[in-house]
């Protein structure tokens, strides 16, 4: 569990967050969305959409010691209303562990599901005083935040173990929430107008790719064990059409030496957080940085249903998509579909 001493921060969605999360709170009707190539709405609707903002927050902690390493990523999708208050929250978390032996051989994890994706396979309910699983408690925390300002969320008190002090919150959530609180705060800080509106709900999707096969370090070469986590925050209207989207990728990597010692980076930035420093523009046919390709992809999703998102070709053959985004969208698409699955 990530505590308030998080050493590596990641904004995130392939943990596309990527790590995808179930919506909490804020339901209703009356939102509107249009396909990226469709007709625009009325001026009053445009004003409403601009007032409601969507945010994605990702925090990652990487840790290495002796012959073991851990990667922990928390993601939050947030919808803020016209007054800047939390209207909906979805949370998720991924915990990954790897090990190495004295010969430098690395053993990677075999299960890349998030806590929300694991469902009953994450056995919290059996040991919970509330007899509630992780998803129930995380959703209860999200519901508790509904109606609060980002500053009020930031000031939410926790004990030394990161667990909430508020009696009302404890009636539905007894897990440590300090990391979730901080991820929600980050999402609020990153929130922007992307087309979301009153009545929408926020969902989160995570997709993980591990291209690491057999890794063994030697005296001449350390090896890098990297996991690519794509996270996508979507807002959906009453018809389950996308009204807004934000997608990000975090790539935490652990280094393993010949004697099996695992070391971790002090800071992990997501691709969105790296901005122009990511360095893609010079190699892009569109002269765009990664975050601009991501924005193009997200705009392209607007107005689409799950089936329509699933039918988007990922081989670059869609001319309209290729005009705004030429990076691989395979993991972005997986994360978006994962978000639909958690609604």
Stretches found by the model and what they are:
Residues 30-48:
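Low-complexity, Pro/Thr/Ser/Glu-rich flexible segments characteristic
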Residues 1-11:
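Bacterial N-terminal signal peptides that target proteins for export
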Residues 15-17:
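A composition-driven surface/loop motif
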Residues 46-343:
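Active-site- and interface-proximal helix/loop "cap" or "latch" segments in soluble metabolic
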Residues 19-23:
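C-terminal motif of bacterial Sec signal peptides marking the signal peptidase cleavage site
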Residues 25-28:
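Bacterial signal peptide processing site
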């Amino acid at each position: 569990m990530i505590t308030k001493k998080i050493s590596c921060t990641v904004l995130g969605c392939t943990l596309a967050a990527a790590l995808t999360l179930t919506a909490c709170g804020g339901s209703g009707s009356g939102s509107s969305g249009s396909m990226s190539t469709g007709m625009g709405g009325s001026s009053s609707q445009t004003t409403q959409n601009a007032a409601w903002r969507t945010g994605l927050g990702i925090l990652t902690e990487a840790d290495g010691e002796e012959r073991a390493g851990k990667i922990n990523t928390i993601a939050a999708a947030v919808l803020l209303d016209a007054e800047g208050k939390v209207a909906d929250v979805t949370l998720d978390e991924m915990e990954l562990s790897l090990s190495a032996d004295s010969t430098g051989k690395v053993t990677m994890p075999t299960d890349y599901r998030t806590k929300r994706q694991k469902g009953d396979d994450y056995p919290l309910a059996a040991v919970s005083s509330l007899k509630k699983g992780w998803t129930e408690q995380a959703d209860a925390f999200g519901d508790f935040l509904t109606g609060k300002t980002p500053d009020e969320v930031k000031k939410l008190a926790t004990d030394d173990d990161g667990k909430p002090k508020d009696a009302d919150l404890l009636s539905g959530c007894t897990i440590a929430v300090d990391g979730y609180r901080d991820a929600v705060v980050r999402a609020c800080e990153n929130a922007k107008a992307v087309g979301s509106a009153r009545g929408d709900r926020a969902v989160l999707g995570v997709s993980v790719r591990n291209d690491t096969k057999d890794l063994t370090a030697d005296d001449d070469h350390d090896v890098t064990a990297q996991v690519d986590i794509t996270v996508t925050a979507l807002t959906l209207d009453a018809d389950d059409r996308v009204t807004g989207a934000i997608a990000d990728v975090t790539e935490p990597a652990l280094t393993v030496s010949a004697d099996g010692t695992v070391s971790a980076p002090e800071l992990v930035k997501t691709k969105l957080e790296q901005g122009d420093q990511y360095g893609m523009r010079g190699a892009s046919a569109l002269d765009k940085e990664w975050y601009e390709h991501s924005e193009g992809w997200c705009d392209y999703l607007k107005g689409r249903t799950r089936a329509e998102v699933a039918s988007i070709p990922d081989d670059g053959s869609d001319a309209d998509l290729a005009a705004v985004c030429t990076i691989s969208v395979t993991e972005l698409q997986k994360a978006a579909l994962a978000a639909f699955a958690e609604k």
